[in-house]
Amino acid sequence: MAGQTIIVSGLNPAAILQSTIGGGASPTAAAAENGTRKVIPLSRDALQDFMLSIITQKLQDEKQPFYVLDLGEVVSLMDQWKSSLPNIRPFYAVKCNPEPSFLSILSAMGSNFDCASRAEIEYVLALGISPDRIVFANPCKPESDIIFAAKVGVNLTTYDSEDEVYKIRKHHPKSELLPRIKPMFDGNARCPMGPKYGALPEEVEPLLRAAQAARLTVSGVSFHIGSGDADSNAYLGAIAAAKEVFETAAKLGMSKMTVLDVGGGFTSGHQFTTAAVAVKSALKQHFDDEPELTIIAEPGRFFAETAFTLATTVIGKRVRGELREYWINDGLYGSMNCVLYDHATVNATPLAVLSNRTNVTCGGSKTFPTTVFGPTCDALDTVLRDYQLPELQVNDWLVFPNMGAYTKAAGSNFNGFNTSTIVTHLAYTYPS
């Protein structure tokens, strides 16, 4: 995995900041030459100035795109999680964004990790994180990955087919299984999971019997309502269905189950507030008689989406009457793949560092209907259409906020534009 890793420790934001910049260094000093990276402390409204400073640095002579990771935003989101869902342990979904610095600060604040492959497990273990803080949350795993999980001690895993039981029995009999059930209502999820994963109600008992016959431990139940779910009511039905699985296991004489994995689907902001209320209500209704129950979740975009900002350079321009067309050096085959695969909507803010240095944000300037293309030769590589932007020139910049979820992680190297080489800079914002 490309990129450097910072070392962070402690739950206190000040302590995290201090450890990321190196012990004893002043907040604006570069980290010691030990592989850690410089972290800049900023007020919340100074992030744009920080990005401008990066753009003007000699390191940006080639004007390559870059990310800024706001560690302060991550701390704030973790505070929200612990305040709203204090009894649910987050297992961050590594697939959403595996940036090492991001994983490090999440780990320091107590997050565990949801991994879906051997490579993701290796990312997490490389940061010194214990294997018992990982759930291997992929219901269908290659046998080689199961063998690796057994070797390194990652035991908690999901399944939703009898064939998976046979693979696990053969290669990792010490596994602790979580049958994954299919929610009957996906609640308008941006990316539904039900068509691919999850046992139907009539399949649950055979799956439990298969694990029982294989003498494997079934520790609990998991589900996932879908990524970016907009309807929190989906959790209500899923938690009720999970309770039925607990009851079925008890009727089969299986050992008492102790884990409930409520999956992902959480998005920061109002959706999270309503989701937290729905989850707590359903848990009280269906699992209030399970005081020893360990409840976990697999949030991805909740922590990642708003913590990252992407800066891109305008590399080309064409004028057709009132229409302005710009090419930038990242696009749908790179970070903006989220537009296609994650059904995301992106927004751009201009930084006219070349054409309007006295008003780089172009406040009050006339705007034009604009199309923004990515850099590849494919016409599909269109980031924005009918979008209002001011007049820009080649070597001006466009900045995209909320670009942390399923962006760089899913990018490609098509046409030789290598998404994996995009650098991430670190900042730590405080409320103004």
Swiss-Prot record:
Record protein name field: Ornithine decarboxylase, chloroplastic
InterPro entries, alphabetized: Ala_racemase/Decarboxylase_C, De-COase2_C, De-COase2_CS, De-COase2_N, De-COase2_pyr-phos_BS, Orn/DAP/Arg_de-COase, Orn_de-COase, PLP-binding_barrel
One Gene Ontology term, aspect cellular component: chloroplast
Modified residues (N6-(pyridoxal phosphate)lysine): K95
Mechanisms controlling activity: Repressed by alpha-difluoromethylornithine (DFMO), 5,5'-dithiobis-(2-nitrobenzoic acid) (DTNB) and salicylaldehyde.
EC number: 4.1.1.17, 4.1.1.18
Gene3D superfamilies linked to this entry: Alanine racemase, Lyase, Ornithine Decarboxylase, Chain A, domain 1
Stated family: Belongs to the Orn/Lys/Arg decarboxylase class-II family.
Keywords, sorted A to Z: Alkaloid metabolism, Chloroplast, Lyase, Plastid, Pyridoxal phosphate, Transit peptide
Cofactor(s) recorded in Swiss-Prot or TrEMBL: pyridoxal 5'-phosphate
Record-annotated active site: C377 (proton donor)
Cell compartment(s), UniProt: Plastid, Chloroplast
Protein purpose: Involved in the biosynthesis of pyridine alkaloid natural products, leading mainly to the production of anabasine, anatabine, nicotine and nornicotine, effective deterrents against herbivores with antiparasitic and pesticide properties (neurotoxins); nornicotine serves as the precursor in the synthesis of the carcinogen compound N'-nitrosonornicotine (NNN). Catalyzes the first and rate-limiting step of polyamine biosynthesis that converts ornithine into putrescine, which is the precursor for the polyamines, spermidine and spermine.
Recorded metabolic or biological pathway in which this protein acts: Alkaloid biosynthesis; nicotine biosynthesis; Amine and polyamine biosynthesis; putrescine biosynthesis via L-ornithine pathway; putrescine from L-ornithine: step 1/1
Activity's dependence on pH: Optimum pH is 8.0 with L-ornithine as substrate. Optimum pH is 6.8 with L-lysine as substrate.
Binding site residues for substrate: Y341, D342, D378
GO molecular function annotations of the record: identical protein binding; lysine decarboxylase activity; ornithine decarboxylase activity; protein homodimerization activity
Pfam families reported for this sequence: Orn_Arg_deC_N, Orn_DAP_Arg_deC
Subunit comment: Homodimer. Only the dimer is catalytically active, as the active sites are constructed of residues from both monomers.
Catalytic reactions of this protein: L-lysine + H(+) = cadaverine + CO2; L-ornithine + H(+) = putrescine + CO2
GO biological process: alkaloid metabolic process; nicotine biosynthetic process; putrescine biosynthetic process from arginine, via ornithine
Site (Stacks against the aromatic ring of pyridoxal phosphate and stabilizes reaction intermediates): H224
Binding site for pyridoxal 5'-phosphate: S227, G265, E298, P299, G300, R301, Y406
UniProt source species: Nicotiana glutinosa (Tobacco)
